[in-house]
């Protein structure tokens, strides 16, 4: 890395800083993204307020652990460093760690959170401060919005797939099921074709590694249409219902494991012809 060149350029970069430059920065970090990703919120607290703004880039190679994505977030609150770190870890776990494009990864990722302290609100020094809970909730909302933007702009994506796994024995097994479905090439290509292929969904659940899984207890809903139960196609289900359920750009799959109280949600996209083209043509 040319440290001397970077250091020499810092003064000019600092002089060029301006509050309205977030969109420029969002565009500057793009790689195979087709559009910049920027999210912001302002939260009113009594007579004062605080804001959180973030940008991110990433359209493939997102999981695990953010893979090749970059995210830069800032707030004008003043927050103790340890509390800021704890809030970021929690928010990332429920957002950037809940998405996947292709299940592939790389060694280059970063997510930073900066607190400038320019808000007129008092500094947060304790996790028991009610303002801290408000901040954590707002931060999670901004990061989840950015995470979903990445999925919607996934390489070649034509569909946004929300996978809700409920009734698991633990959150981890819910995640195992959700990500096995989300990263199945057969599921993702069926999604691209708007094919309500319940067999591929059940097959993915079956190989997710759950101990003593009773397939007869599993239920599948696509956009609220019951498509499978007791290990087979639901008696009330028709192919016409499935086609209608799969037609929208946004598709929600609800998986009922019925073996506990845990649940989680994961977001992914489909595999299209363009996904193959983009990655066949891309050169690093």
What are the functions of these language-model segments?
Residues 1-284:
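A structural signal for small-residue-enriched, beta-sheet-centric alpha/beta enzyme cores
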């Amino acid at each position: 890395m040319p440290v001397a060149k970077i250091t020499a350029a810092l003064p000019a970069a600092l002089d060029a800083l301006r509050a309205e430059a977030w969109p420029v920065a969002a565009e500057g970090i793009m790689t195979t993204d087709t559009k910049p990703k920027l999210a912001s919120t302002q939260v009113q607290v009594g007579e004062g307020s605080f804001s959180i703004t973030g940008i991110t880039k990433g359209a493939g190679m997102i999981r695990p652990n953010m893979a090749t994505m970059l995210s830069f977030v800032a707030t004008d609150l003043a927050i103790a460093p340890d509390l800021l770190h704890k809030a970021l870890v929690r928010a990332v776990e429920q957002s950037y760690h809940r998405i996947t494009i292709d299940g592939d990864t790389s060694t280059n990722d970063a997510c930073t959170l900066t607190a400038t302290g320019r808000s007129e609100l008092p500094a947060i020094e304790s996790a028991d401060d009610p303002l801290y809970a408000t901040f954590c909730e707002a931060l999670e909302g901004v990061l989840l919005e950015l995470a979903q933007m990445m999925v919607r702009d996934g390489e070649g994506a034509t569909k946004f797939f929300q996978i809700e796994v409920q009734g698991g024995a633990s959150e981890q097994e819910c995640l195992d099921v959700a990500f096995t479905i989300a990263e199945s090439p057969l599921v993702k290509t069926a999604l691209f074709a708007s094919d309500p292929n319940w067999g591929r969904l059940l097959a993915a659940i079956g190989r997710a590694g759950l101990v003593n899984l009773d397939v007869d207890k599993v239920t599948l809903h696509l956009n609220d249409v019951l498509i499978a139960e007791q290990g087979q196609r639901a008696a009330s289900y028709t192919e016409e219902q499935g086609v209608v359920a799969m037609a929208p750009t946004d598709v929600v799959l609800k998986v009922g494991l019925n073996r506990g109280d845990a649940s989680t949600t994961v977001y992914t996209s489909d595999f299209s012809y363009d996904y193959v083209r983009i990655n066949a043509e891309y050169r690093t």
